[in-house]
Structure formats: C-alpha cells, structure tokens
A protein has these predicted regions:
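Anionic-ligand binding region
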Residues: 138-152
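A short glycine-rich beta-strand->turn/loop micro-motif centered on a GG-aromatic cluster
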Residues: 124-133
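Conserved small/polar residues in nucleotide/adenosyl-binding loops
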Residues: 158-160
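Buried hydrophobic packing segments
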Residues: 114, 118, 134-141
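Short gly/pro/ser/thr-enriched loop/turn and capping motifs at secondary-structure boundaries
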Residues: 42-44, 70, 132-136, 154
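A residue-level signal for beta-strand positions that form part of recognition/binding surfaces
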Residues: 8, 152-153
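Short, catalytically relevant binding-site loops at active-site mouths
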Residues: 105-107, 132-134, 142
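Class I S-adenosyl-L-methionine
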Residues: 1-18, 23-124
Length: 160
C-alpha cells in the first residue's frame, strides 16, 4: 500500500472579518489537522486570530511560520525554505495542512512561495479562495466597483 502524502492547502481568511471567510475555506480548516499560520517577530498571528473567529480550530496542531520582512531575495528565499522545512514533516506523515493567508490566497500571498517549492518536490497543493480587501472595501462603502460596460482598473504600486 502506498503511503499517503498530506496536501498543503492555501486558505484565504479574507480582509479581517471571520464572517467574510468562504464556506470552502472554513470547511478546509475543519478537515485539516494542522494549521500553519504566519507569525510576526512579536509573536502575533493575525490570520490565525481571524480564522479562530470562524470556529473549528479546537484540537488542531498550530504551526507558527516566520517569514522575513525583507527586500533581499536571498533572505526571502531562506525564509521560504525554512517554512517548507517546518511544514514538510506533517505532509510526510499524511497530515493535510492548511496555511492561512490574509485576503485572497492568490494575491501577493506567502502561500505561493511554499506552493512552488513543495510542488517541485512532488507534494500536492490546493487553494481555497477568499474575499480580497478591495472587494470588501467596496461592499463596506456600498459602492460598486464597476457598472454597466465599465471595465475595472487595478493599479499595483510596486515601489512607493
């Protein structure tokens, strides 16, 4: 019998309100025994705090992940490799792991770096989409982002 490898799920927790987490994201958290969460140098885990508001985390293994806040590519790469090394034993043990991400997991998310590294090693990954902050802000302001035949305009500022 072939040994089962765990799946790394990138789970979007949305813009801060647990009620804006998708059903798919919440269900993913409920089924994964391991929850990986980015942790600040000061020890805060904002994405985990949001996910706890949605419930379903009792009895889960919480795996804090530290990511370097640097523009140095070598420092970032080392940080991503350390996170992969922290997650890999759980996947090797067949434990599905949910990695929490603020906003949507497909927009500037740390999950993408781990996804790329782990997929290159043959590990399966999947994503649970979320509500991006710009959509939540429009809803909060009760303002549509587009109307009629308008095309949305998205600007990304790389260097401020």
């Amino acid at each position: 019998m072939e040994k089962r490898i765990g799946v790394l799920y990138g789970v979007s927790v949305g813009p801060g309100d647990p009620e804006l987490m998708t059903l798919k994201a919440v269900r993913c958290l409920e089924k994964c025994p391991v929850i990986a969460a980015p942790q600040t140098a000061g020890g805060r885990m904002l994405a985990l705090d949001i996910a706890r508001g949605a419930g379903g985390l009792d009895g889960k293994t919480i795996l804090p992940l530290r990511f370097a806040m640097s523009r140095d590519p070598a420092v970032l790469a080392a940080s991503h490799k350390e996170a992969v090394q922290a997650v890999r034993p759980y996947l090797d043990a067949g434990q599905d792991t949910a990695m929490l991400n603020l906003g949507d997991v497909s927009i500037y998310a740390t999950f993408g770096y781990l996804q790329c590294l782990l997929e290159a090693e043959g590990y399966p990954t999947a994503m649970a989409a979320g509500v991006p902050s710009f959509c939540a802000a429009a809803a909060r302001l009760n303002v549509p982002l587009t109307g009629g035949m308008d095309a949305p305009l998205t600007l990304s500022l790389i260097h401020i």
